[in-house]
């Protein structure tokens, strides 16, 4: 199994350093690693500042990240609880992402997302969701699902869930 195991990691995901484009591949598969090295030497050249920032991130103690992790866990739990309380909505609890995929009681989430932006508002507010079909490689998957990021403050997430609940009660497929 060792020759078939590949670990891929990046500082952009691990340390929320979007755009840094620095990562690693670890495997005992020598052929894979040789091919990866050829590709890396021919095509990749991360900016110097990203390299310096990445090295600093690797040396940062875990305690620095604990507060942020706690905040995102709280946001996640708030969003999931709110979505689970909406009739017809199904959602799995993410374990490491800053977003969730929610199945909605709609036929086409793309149409619903567009309707939210063009035709729905409560007190001049609406909510924006990303149709999930674009995140699947299999055509037809995720048609009634949306991706919702929990990068907002907890209070804003609560309001967004209430808006989504109201929108679903008004929406006609």
Give the role of each language-model region.
Residues 1-173:
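PLP-dependent class I/II
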């Amino acid at each position: 199994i060792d020759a078939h195991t590949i670990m891929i990691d990046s500082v952009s995901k691990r340390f929320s350093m979007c755009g840094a484009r620095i990562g690693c591949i670890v495997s005992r598969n020598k052929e894979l690693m040789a091919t990866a090295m050829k590709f890396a030497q021919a095509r990749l050249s991360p900016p110097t500042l990203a390299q310096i920032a990445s090295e600093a991130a690797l040396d940062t103690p875990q305690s620095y990240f604990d507060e942020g992790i706690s905040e995102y866990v709280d946001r996640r739990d708030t969003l999931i609880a709110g979505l689970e309380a909406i009739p017809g909505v199904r959602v799995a609890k993410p374990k490491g992402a800053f977003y969730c995929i929610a199945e909605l009681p709609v036929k086409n989430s793309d149409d619903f997302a567009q309707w939210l932006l063009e035709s729905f508002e409560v007190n001049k507010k609406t909510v924006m969701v990303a149709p999930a079909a674009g995140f699947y490689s299999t055509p037809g998957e995720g048609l009634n699902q949306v991706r919702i990021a929990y990068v907002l403050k907890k209070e804003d997430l609560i309001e967004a869930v209430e808006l989504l609940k109201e929108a679903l009660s008004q929406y006609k497929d």
